[in-house]
Amino acid sequence: MNNQSAKKSPTRLTYISDIIEISPYLRRLVLSGEQLANFPADQQGAYVKVLIPQPGETTVNMTLTGPNAAIKRSYTIREFDPVRGQLSLDFVINKHTGPATDWAKLANVGDTVAIAGPGPLKMNRFDFNDYLLFGDSTSINAVDALIKRLPATAKGHIIMLVNSHQEQALLSQHPLLKTHWLVLNDSITAEQQIDWLLDKLELFGDLPAVTQVFVGLEATQVRVIKQYLLEQQQLPLSSISATGYWKRNTDADTFGKQKQMQPL
């Protein structure tokens, strides 16, 4: 990372000041610390990189690059309270294993962790009349932040896949956007999830040509939704902000390399 990038994305040392169990599958870690004093306000929906220690490390690793770099994972900012200097991040747990989810599951109040960022919002157009927002448990905070930034006159639909009913409370209500929920369980297959998403799209009929879309889902779901919107709805690519938050049966490091070689 060059000096300019480092200035844009400083590394900060924090500690866990509170832990909130949102659901059996979602755990909120509230981070505090003196180095959050100059963290920029109004960053809900942006993201930070959480620097996870390498296996066997017992001290905080604040190294961003090189062979001894920390494991880096992106997490959406749920809330930043500049008065209290508290940053809230939600971690999916008990659905898979990996460095970040394993660390978050075992984390305790008082533990220290480094973060870098913030990075930008995934979507930054809030002057449209019509919106489609797709999300799941990994992107629900990004979707919530977008809802709060939309004008009250915006229309459209919010389509969410979540791991528990408790997570529904995380999403703000918008007067003119209808929310559609699918609460997942082990009996709902990956194929059935995609079928449900496509069924919803077909029920919406022809979308206005200027619809703005956010898609924050599993990688295969992102590809299917994006293809449908481009080919069946003839939406311009510039109107679609699509991000694969994770990929089924693929670890985050491998998925990151795949996205660099073949963007979604």
UniProtKB/Swiss-Prot annotation:
SUPFAM superfamilies (UniProt xref): Riboflavin synthase domain-like
Enzyme Commission number, as recorded: 1.16.-.-
Pfam families registered for this protein in UniProt: FAD_binding_9, SIP
Keyword Lyase attached: no
Residue intervals passing through the bilayer: none
Alphabetical keyword list: FAD, Flavoprotein, Nucleotide-binding, Oxidoreductase
UniProt KW Transmembrane keyword: no
Superkingdom, natural source: Bacteria
Entry cofactors: FAD
MF terms (GO), sorted A to Z: metal ion binding; nucleotide binding; oxidoreductase activity
UniProt-annotated binding residues for FAD: R73, S74, T76, D90, V92, H96, A100, T101, K247, N249, T250, A252
Residues of the FAD-binding FR-type domain: 9-127
Function of the protein: Ferric-siderophore reductase involved in iron removal from the siderophores after their transport into the cell. Catalyzes the reduction of the ferric iron bound to the hydroxamate siderophores produced by Shewanella to ferrous iron. Can use a ferredoxin as electron donor. Despite the clear evidence for the interaction with NAD(P)H, no direct reduction of the enzyme by these compounds is observed, nor consumption of NAD(P)H, suggesting that NADH and NADPH are not the physiological electron donors.
Protein family according to the UniProt entry: Belongs to the SIP oxidoreductase family.
Name of the protein this chain belongs to: Ferric siderophore reductase
Species of provenance: Shewanella frigidimarina (strain NCIMB 400)
